[in-house]
Amino acid sequence: MSRWKAKHDKEHYYKLAKKQNYRSRASYKLKQLDKKYSLLKPDYNVVDLGAAPGGWSQVVAETIGEEGKGQIISVDLEYIKPIDHEAYTGVKGDFTTKETQDIIIELIDGKADVVLSDAAPKLTGIKDIDNFRAYDLSMAVIEIIDNILKNNGNLIMKAFQGEAYQEIIKNLKKKFRNVKTTKPNSSRKRSAEMYVIARGFRGSKK
């Protein structure tokens, strides 16, 4: 793909997000993933990790509707502007800590049907450091699901192709019955980001 087309596509989704009142163009990544894989249902309890600014949580809030059967818990170290939806709750905290995980479990009165993570590490431009940070973040998400995801639940997470990418997939295959990777049309083609669809959580082995 040419740089011109990549820039054009990025601007297209940015403008579309502004027009449709989404907080980021990343909203379209989840919409495309859900359309392809049917990941979200109206009565699901969903936890969105690294949720700021809230684009994915907006999509979930649309899906679970106004009946209040499902819930969306958005977690981030940064402040997230609340979403005007009765099923929404924001949590400002570090999802890798037990304290924040306990808050999540209490809020959803059990465990989540789906865990989402579009989180990305802070990049330095130094390849080795950035690869390590991306791997470290992915593994943090994989570890937290033991505590907050229901048996047979699903995980949708961003991962970055690099030296440790296959190690991430290997770890997920140990925990889930089915693992697929994909790149939505709204992702930049030159980007190293991939999205992992992991379904059928086997449950914690602890």
UniProtKB/Swiss-Prot annotation:
SUPFAM superfamilies hit by this protein: S-adenosyl-L-methionine-dependent methyltransferases (SSF53335)
Q: Which domain of life is it from?
A: Archaea
**Per the record, GO CC terms?**
cytoplasm
Name any one GO molecular function.
rRNA (uridine-2'-O-)-methyltransferase activity
* Top EC class for this record: transferase
User: What protein is this chain from?
Assistant: Ribosomal RNA large subunit methyltransferase E
The record's section on InterPro entries has:
RNA_methyltr_RlmE, RNA_MeTrfase_FtsJ_dom, rRNA-MeTfrase_E, SAM-dependent_MTases_sf
The subcellular location is: Cytoplasm
E.C. number: 2.1.1.166
Name of encoding gene? rlmE
Q: Which residues bind S-adenosyl-L-methionine?
A: 54, 56, 76, 94, 118
Q: Which residues participate directly in catalysis?
A: 158
HAMAP family per the record?
A: RNA_methyltr_E
Annotated source species = Methanosphaera stadtmanae (strain ATCC 43021 / DSM 3091 / JCM 11832 / MCB-3)
Principal subcellular localisation of the protein: cytoplasm
Q: Which reaction does it catalyse?
A: uridine(2552) in 23S rRNA + S-adenosyl-L-methionine = 2'-O-methyluridine(2552) in 23S rRNA + S-adenosyl-L-homocysteine + H(+)
As for what it does, the entry says: Specifically methylates the uridine in position 2552 of 23S rRNA at the 2'-O position of the ribose in the fully assembled 50S ribosomal subunit.
